[in-house]
């Protein structure tokens, strides 16, 4: 007789080899055919809403590993919330305007911006943006991200632009929008102003120069200290040589001590506490302090500009520190925020001798036409000729750069439009406190940024963007903006999009009969566009308030930690300014993706991990599993080695699911399920461990701690299941009669475990959970077309059975000692497989009573025979001694012959005439099977 045919061996067509790169696209196609996004929304329609508002990625180029991580995290949130019964639509968006697209159009398409009119150039930009959106949309879908991909929100949509104009108009109406001449971050390469969020800091090598400004008027303060002023100088220090031509003042701190310090024949005015530092940096020799004054005593003195022989007045400023330099700060009001503010106090001109391309104008005689960076050498030579260059050297320091072109930027005073953050700063700080920040340090970070930030420069000198909806009177030059003009522009954009601004005249746009206060009816349009952060920062109004599936405020904004100064902040500012509160209730941030050694990814280092390549090699589910493999609130490491490890963990999880499926091939959950009371104790223990997993994942996911998925699920599958419960269960599943109560108890437990596990996996392992679901049989109340339509598992109180937990946890702990004893016997060649063994247990009285509470310990220990000795019996001298329990163990070869069917050794093998090669237990099972 072929006894193999009498065993209930696993059967499943669920493949062992995942082959995800091939299988996942097939699953995606099925999701599209069933319109899974709408199906999920219909299921939860009318229930409590949970809105995660998508921060729009920039429509430019392929997605990178950080973008992939961000989208997967969002998808996990939304899928979890829908399984918890929330109506949780996900409307993805794209940021479509701005400089990067202009640059790509010029670079890739070879477009010459200045040879095209704005309308033509904008059309090329729009077409490029749409091509990038389609490219990224397919990449996001390939990650398994579920969303309204056919109707995303785009910042270039006419409806969106109209709503953005409304936000701008409301801020203007409340007095928060103004035009002013101010030093702003300026990129000469891109020829535009930049917001703080568009600045990155990189190390830069610059000049470090000490410059002498001879005193022209000391207000009589130095009389009697020096004979005359011909050799008395204020000494300044700067790392921006090119700003010297724009110097109009020298700033001192009113409370610092400043010394007239004699070095040789010259007297230098330096902060007393910086004299030694200056001496060291300049190589000056011995000195003598002639006198010391408070900074405020020197206010109003005049020095001579070393190049132009004009006055450079001495002013006071609290911004002057002793961190570096001389305590005398070179002040060019047209080139620095603090310089500008001090200059305003003293009525100084915001002199800006540099044009939008970075070249000196005729306001800097002698340097006209020189690029600012190239002028450094000439300026230093002129200072040297004037005997004003005290010392120079090169230093490396952190310097602001344009985030797009990576060029160094400069501060440049120009006329710009600003949002006055000062007008609603306190409201914004209050709103921050009302939001839940994950991790908690995010609150302090954005609080500091908002508290310390300057007014927001919102104008850009480009054409691909939303125009600033302001008109100027051609007669008096006064700007025109009111409810009437804003409504006219808003409605125009709603109908025709913002291209209309560039296609129509002011007269065609403005309502008929509108006049300036001066009486003129002739107007021209503003030519600047809005900062792209104003675009995306208006999404709460343009999307949350207008989309029929969404609501304001959102439950969650989830982006990288750099967005505290970006989208989180621009959204907060526009919302507080117009609605008085934050547009979000919760904000979660993740770190950046770095390589396996914690280094930033870069092409030059060759350490870039491309998500497309990961998907091609391993599949999207392995990438998704990586996303939850570590605490993503810090920087996340990835590398080929790390991904290989993740793929191995995935394989183990998949194998566990395959084992469960394989042993449920003949199980019908509607007919074969047993009630909890009829399960064996070990089955109840397995359900306790499952229940613990449900509880842990639910609590963690509720707190957005999705990294708590990886290790618990891995441990449950590998340790609790594969290495323990499922290993023990094999005998009952394979050798017992197919319809026996014992086997049905095991299958009931396996079904509950699989049904629960596949649902727990669904938000993370989107494709694999679906593949498992489609291979499962389901009970009539659970027979959904997709696992995404199923409910999240509930914690079952009855599974937390204290008696079962305590008893079986202790036995499995003791089982570790049994395994150690078996391993020693194996190493001593006493046994091969554990089923070759007989285990003799010599326990204490207490443990003896404990062991008597179990039947068939041989199946738990996976040996052929267990002999429990009386506590009075003495164990052999060579017995294994447990370190944790009062227990000794011996291992010998089991008596009897090996059963051909169950592979256990038994003295009953050969005693059954009809079945001479199998044990009595197996013979009994076969006879029982034949009766069915």
Swiss-Prot record:
Where is this protein chiefly located? cytoplasm
Q: Where in the cell is it found?
A: Cytoplasm
Renumbered ranges of motif 'KMSKS' region = 600-604
Q: Which residues bind ATP?
A: 603
Lineage top rank: taxon: Bacteria
User: What top-level class of enzyme does the UniProt entry assign?
Assistant: ligase
Binding-site residues for L-isoleucyl-5'-AMP, renumbered to this chain? 559
Q: Could you tell me which InterPro entries the record lists for this protein?
A: aa-tRNA-synth_I_CS, aa-tRNA-synth_Ia, Anticodon_Ile_BEm, Ile-tRNA-ligase, Ile-tRNA-ligase_type1, Ile-tRNA_ligase, M/V/L/I-tRNA-synth_anticd-bd, Rossmann-like_a/b/a_fold
Q: Does the keyword Coiled coil apply?
A: no
- GO CC terms, sorted: cytosol
> Cofactor binding mode, per the note?
Binds 1 zinc ion per subunit.
The record's PROSITE patterns line, in alphabetical order, gives:
AA_TRNA_LIGASE_I
**Record text on subunit structure and interactions:** Monomer.
- Show the domain comment: IleRS has two distinct active sites: one for aminoacylation and one for editing. The misactivated valine is translocated from the active site to the editing site, which sterically excludes the correctly activated isoleucine. The single editing site contains two valyl binding pockets, one specific for each substrate (Val-AMP or Val-tRNA(Ile)).
Summarizing the function annotation, the protein's role is: Catalyzes the attachment of isoleucine to tRNA(Ile). As IleRS can inadvertently accommodate and process structurally similar amino acids such as valine, to avoid such errors it has two additional distinct tRNA(Ile)-dependent editing activities. One activity is designated as 'pretransfer' editing and involves the hydrolysis of activated Val-AMP. The other activity is designated 'posttransfer' editing and involves deacylation of mischarged Val-tRNA(Ile).
Q: What is this protein called?
A: Isoleucine--tRNA ligase
What is the organism lineage in this UniProt record? Bacteria, Bacillati, Bacillota, Clostridia, Thermoanaerobacterales
Q: Gene of origin?
A: ileS
């Amino acid at each position: 007789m072929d006894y193999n045919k009498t065993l209930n061996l696993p059967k499943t067509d669920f493949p062992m080899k995942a082959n995800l790169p091939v299988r996942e696209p097939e699953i995606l196609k099925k999701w599209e055919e069933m319109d899974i996004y709408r199906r999920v929304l219909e299921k939860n329609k009318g229930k409590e809403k949970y809105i995660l508002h998508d921060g729009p990625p920039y429509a430019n180029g392929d997605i990178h590993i950080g973008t992939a991580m961000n989208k997967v995290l969002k998808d996990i949130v939304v899928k979890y919330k829908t399984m918890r019964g929330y109506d949780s639509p996900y409307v993805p968006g794209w940021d479509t305007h701005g400089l990067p697209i202009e640059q790509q159009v010029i670079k890739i398409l070879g477009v010459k911006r200045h040879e095209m009119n704005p309308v033509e150039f904008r059309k090329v930009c729009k077409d490029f943006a749409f091509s990038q959106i389609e490219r990224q949309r397919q990449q996001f879908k390939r990650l398994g991200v579920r969303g309204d991909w056919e109707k995303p929100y785009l910042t270039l949509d006419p409806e969106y632009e109209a709503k953005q104009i409304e936000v701008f108009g409301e801020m203007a109406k409340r007095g928060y929008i103004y035009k002013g001449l101010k030093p702003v971050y300026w990129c000469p390469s891109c020829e535009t102003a930049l917001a703080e969020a568009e600045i990155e800091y990189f190390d830069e090598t610059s000049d470090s120069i000490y410059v002498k400004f001879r005193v022209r008027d000391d207000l009589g303060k130095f009389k009697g200290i020096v004979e005359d002023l011909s050799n008395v100088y204020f000494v300044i220090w700067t790392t921006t040589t090119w700003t010297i031509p724009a110097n109009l003042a020298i700033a001192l701190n009113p409370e610092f001590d400043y010394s007239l310090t004699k070095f040789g024949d010259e007297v230098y005015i330096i902060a007393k506490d910086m004299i030694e530092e200056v001496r060291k940096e300049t190589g000056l020799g011995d000195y003598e302090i002639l006198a010391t004054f408070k900074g405020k005593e020197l206010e109003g003195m005049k020095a001579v500009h070393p190049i132009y022989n004009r006055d450079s007045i001495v002013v006071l400023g609290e911004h002057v520190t002793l961190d570096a330099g001389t305590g005398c700060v070179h002040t060019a009001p047209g080139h620095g925020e603090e310089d500008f503010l001090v200059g305003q106090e003293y009525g100084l001109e915001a002199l800006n001798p540099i044009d939008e391309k970075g070249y000196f104008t005729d306001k800097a005689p002698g340097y006209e036409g020189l690029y600012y960076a190239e002028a450094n050498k000439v300026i230093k030579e002129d200072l040297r000729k004037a005997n004003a260059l005290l010392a120079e050297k090169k230093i490396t320091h952190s310097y602001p750069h344009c985030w797009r072109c990576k060029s160094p930027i400069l501060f440049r005073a120009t006329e710009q439009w600003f949002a006055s953050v000062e007008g609603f700063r306190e409201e914004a700080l209050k709103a921050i406190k009302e939001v839940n920040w994950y991790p908690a340090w995010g609150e302090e970070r954005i609080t500091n940024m908002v508290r310390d930030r300057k007014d927001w420069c919102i104008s850009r000198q480009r054409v691909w963007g939303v125009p600033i909806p302001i008109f100027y009177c051609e007669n008096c030059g006064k700007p025109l903006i009111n409810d009437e003009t804003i409504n006219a522009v808003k409605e125009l954009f709603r109908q025709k999009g913002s291209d209309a601004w560039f296609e129509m005249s002011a007269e065609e746009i403005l309502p008929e009969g509108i006049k300036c206060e001066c009486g003129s009816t002739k107007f021209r349009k503003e030519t600047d566009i809005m900062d792209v952060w104003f675009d995306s920062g208006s999404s709460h109004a343009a999307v949350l308030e207008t989309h029929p599936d969404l609501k304001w405020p959102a439950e969650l904004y989830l982006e990288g930690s750099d967005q505290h100064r970006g989208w989180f902040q621009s959204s907060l500012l526009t919302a507080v300014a117009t609605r008085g509160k934050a547009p979000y209730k919760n904000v979660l941030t993740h770190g950046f993706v770095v390589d396996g050694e914690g280094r930033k990814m870069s092409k030059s280092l060759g350490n870039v991990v491309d998500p497309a390549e990961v998907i091609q090699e391993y599949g999207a589910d392995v990438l998704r599993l990586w996303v939850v493999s570590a605490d993503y609130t810090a920087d996340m490491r990835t590398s080929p080695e790390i991904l290989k490890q993740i793929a191995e963990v995935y394989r183990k999880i998949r194998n566990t699911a395959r084992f469960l499926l394989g042993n449920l091939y003949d199980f019908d959950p509607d007919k074969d399920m047993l009630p909890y009371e009829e399960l064996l104790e070990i089955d109840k223990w397995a359900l306790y461990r499952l229940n613990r997993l449900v509880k842990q994942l639910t609590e963690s996911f509720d707190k957005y701690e999705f990294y708590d998925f990886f290790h618990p699920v891995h441990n449950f599958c590998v340790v609790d299941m594969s290495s323990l419960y499922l290993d023990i269960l094999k005998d009952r599943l394979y050798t017992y009669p197919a319809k026996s109560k014992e086997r049905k108890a095991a299958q009931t437990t396996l079904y509950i475990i699989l049904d629960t596990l596949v649902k727990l996996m669904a938000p993370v392992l989107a494709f694999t959970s679906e593949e498992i679901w489609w291979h499962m049989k389901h009970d009539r109340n659970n027979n959904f077309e997709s696992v995404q339509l199923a409910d999240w598992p509930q914690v079952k109180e009855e599974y937390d059975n204290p008696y079962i937990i305590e008893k079986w946890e202790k036995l499995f702990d003791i089982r570790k000692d049994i395994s150690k004893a078996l391993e020693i016997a194996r190493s001593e060649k006493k046994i091969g497989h554990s089923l070759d063994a007989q285990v003799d247990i010599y326990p204490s009285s207490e443990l003896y009573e404990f062991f008597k509470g179990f039947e068939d310990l041989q199946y738990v220990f996976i040996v052929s025979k267990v002999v429990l000795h009386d506590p009075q019996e003495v164990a052999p001298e060579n017995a294994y001694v447990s370190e944790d329990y009062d227990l000794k163990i011996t291992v010998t070869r089991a008596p009897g012959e090996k059963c051909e069917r169950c592979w256990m050794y038994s003295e009953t093998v050969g005693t059954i005439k009809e079945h001479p090669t199998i044990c009595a237990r197996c013979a009994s099972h076969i006879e029982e099977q034949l009766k069915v």
